[in-house]
Amino acid sequence: MTLPPSLRSVEVDGAQPYTISIAPGLLADGARLARHVRGRHVLLLSDTQVAPHYAAGVRAALLQARPDLQLGELVIAAGEASKTLDNFSLAITALAELGATRDACVFALGGGVVGDLAGFAAACWMRGVDCVQLPTSLLAMVDSSVGGKTAVDIPQGKNLVGAFHPPRAVIADTDTLRTLPTRELRAGLAEVIKYGAIGDPLFFQWLHAERRALLDGDPAALAQAIARSCEHKADIVARDPLEKGERALLNLGHTFGHAIETEQGYGAPGNDNLNHGEAVAVGMVLAARLSAALGMADAQDTEALRTLLHEFGLPTQIPTGLAPEALLGRMRLDKKNIAGRLRLVLWRGIGKAEVVPDVDEAAVLEILAD
């Protein structure tokens, strides 16, 4: 088999190891896609933004490599508002109507919403079938497709119903980034910046130096950013697959960010609410400011993080109209909390983060109100 000329691979070790493949043209590689299908039943799950560009090609590539496949398809509306129990039920129904057996495979073709929903359906159908992640957004390539965290949202909060279900493979075709809207590219770069902020000062500096190339969608710069981000996440996930300890560090900014997303209403095509990456960007600044207020981080490092996010065109302030008390109420439902006490990922400066139990709510409220 001939390998793509620029293929990068990242191995995720653990009880269920898998490979992240990163290169252009991978969605057309039917043999690569089909090798992960153990049986004959495949459900291709996508959304209304991605499916028109790529679903037919993926279907054709799979059937060319495996003409015996029985292939079903489910397309949901694009946007975080689709990550619901209702759409989860549609995915389960699609698997049932397909006659999917325990050797079936769900292909998640899309961004983080599709990946989370498809992964959760795969985790639950017959107590677990294979899922292959085909991320088409930068955010999904560097974060949500890797690590096996799957979930849907409910009105009370984000990702509150889900399961750990590692994918059989992650296949990231970087050609899909060519059709990614600029706002979505920047949202993904927020998660990329997070990796530098929590564990890699040199990567943080590289991102500053390469910011123009990354924002312009330079393929080489993006491939390097994706591979480095995946390496960071793979290292942590291998040591802590079920988020019992250090994996929580990957959530820098997420407790604040999820509260913003839930309180304002989820970002989606047609509204101006912050999307996930934008909310995480604001959340990282809030976490850094709280860390500085608690004497954990230097104000100069906090400003360096805020500046870098701003240079990438990302928001750094809470949207107007969100009450601090309401945001704190959302934060109290965060999955990292223990015994009803806030447990936050805070910052020690560029390249250092830690989980802090029992954070003073008054200090958090002061940051939210400032």
Curated annotation (Swiss-Prot):
Q: Please list the GO biological process terms of this entry.
A: amino acid biosynthetic process; aromatic amino acid family biosynthetic process; chorismate biosynthetic process
Pathway it works in = Metabolic intermediate biosynthesis; chorismate biosynthesis; chorismate from D-erythrose 4-phosphate and phosphoenolpyruvate: step 2/7
Q: Which keywords fit this entry according to its UniProt record? A: Amino-acid biosynthesis, Aromatic amino acid biosynthesis, Cobalt, Cytoplasm, Lyase, Metal-binding, NAD, Nucleotide-binding, Zinc
Q: Which residues bind NAD(+)?
A: 112-116, 136-137, 149, 158, 176-179
Subcellular localization(s) per the UniProt record: Cytoplasm
What catalytic reaction does the record list? 7-phospho-2-dehydro-3-deoxy-D-arabino-heptonate = 3-dehydroquinate + phosphate
Cofactor notes: Binds 1 divalent metal cation per subunit. Can use either Co(2+) or Zn(2+).
Keyword Plastid in annotation: no
Q: What broad class describes the main subcellular location of this protein?
A: cytoplasm
Q: Where does Zn(2+) bind?
A: 191, 254, 276
Recorded E.C. number(s)? 4.2.3.4
Q: What does this protein do?
A: Catalyzes the conversion of 3-deoxy-D-arabino-heptulosonate 7-phosphate (DAHP) to dehydroquinate (DHQ).
Q: What is this protein called?
A: 3-dehydroquinate synthase
Its source organism is Xanthomonas campestris pv. campestris (strain ATCC 33913 / DSM 3586 / NCPPB 528 / LMG 568 / P 25)
- From which lineage does this chain's organism come? Bacteria, Pseudomonadati, Pseudomonadota, Gammaproteobacteria, Lysobacterales
